[in-house]
Amino acid sequence: MRRRPGIGGLQKAAAARDQYRLLGENVAKLRTDMMKEQLSTFRSQLEEFARKHKNDIRKNPAFRAQFHEMCANIGVDPLASNKGFWAELLGIGDFYYELGVQIIEVCMLTRSHNGGLISLQELCNHLRQRRKKDREAVTEDDCLRAISKLKVLGSGFEVITIGKKKLVRSVPTELNKDHNQILELAQGQGFVIVEEVQRRLSWTSGRVIDALETLLEEGLAMIDNGHKDGKCRYWFPCVSSVYSSIGSDT
């Protein structure tokens, strides 16, 4: 028979476990301290980098996106406060505040024909038209950052993804799965017809018409019934290039 460890053996084992635990805690603390020191060094280097390349960050969209990525990697948010160090150094807070105001204006001006749902690409095109005289170009990444800041206003602005498109919603319309599937189908031509939706999604005509009627009521769709085949086209400005130029000069 194997002899069980005595009291002395148990005490030695417990002491060894305590030593390993203390050693592990010391190693973890050392690693944490080293990481904090490295992050502090990175932040200092990032501040110096920002001072040196201030104009590039403001004027060059690609450079600005890379700068934001660098900040995110070390937990720095240049947009966290308009009165913060980064906002004062770069004026980034003002840039995104002005962009946010322009986004609201574009969404309001185009709401009558898209129902408050506009593709991110179209929104950027409108903004570029408005800012042609400015030297600060605007990218989709800039728009996404500005919209994320609008959420604090409780204004209902939200970015949703349907199929391959990102859409900006500026009204509190709730889209269900059926609505999203129809919008995804419409991305091909900008419109759908009832029979096509029935065939592609294996739905009943009642289900298709019910979903389309809701989208019409919300102002997200438009009916075109002037075709020789007698089939109504349900157009969706938010995914149709046909309507992308509407309001661009406003």
UniProtKB/Swiss-Prot annotation:
GO biological process terms, semicolon-separated: multivesicular body sorting pathway; protein transport
Its family?
Belongs to the SNF8 family.
Q: Which gene encodes it?
A: VP22-1
Q: Which source organism?
A: Arabidopsis thaliana (Mouse-ear cress)
Its quaternary organisation is:
Component of the endosomal sorting complex required for transport II (ESCRT-II), composed of VPS22, VPS25 and VPS36.
Which protein is depicted?
Vacuolar protein sorting-associated protein 22 homolog 1
Instruction: Provide the protein's localization.
Output: Endosome
What functional role does this protein have?
Component of the endosomal sorting complex required for transport II (ESCRT-II), which is required for multivesicular body (MVB) formation and sorting of endosomal cargo proteins into MVBs. The ESCRT-II complex is probably involved in the recruitment of the ESCRT-III complex.
Keywords on record: Coiled coil, Endosome, Protein transport, Transport
| Coiled-coil boundaries | 35-55
A Pfam family that the UniProt record links to this protein: EAP30
Entries under SUPFAM superfamilies matching the protein:
Winged helix' DNA-binding domain
Q: Check the UniProt entry and state the signal peptide residues, or none.
A: none
List GO terms (cellular component aspect): ESCRT II complex
- Name the principal localization, coarsely classed: other
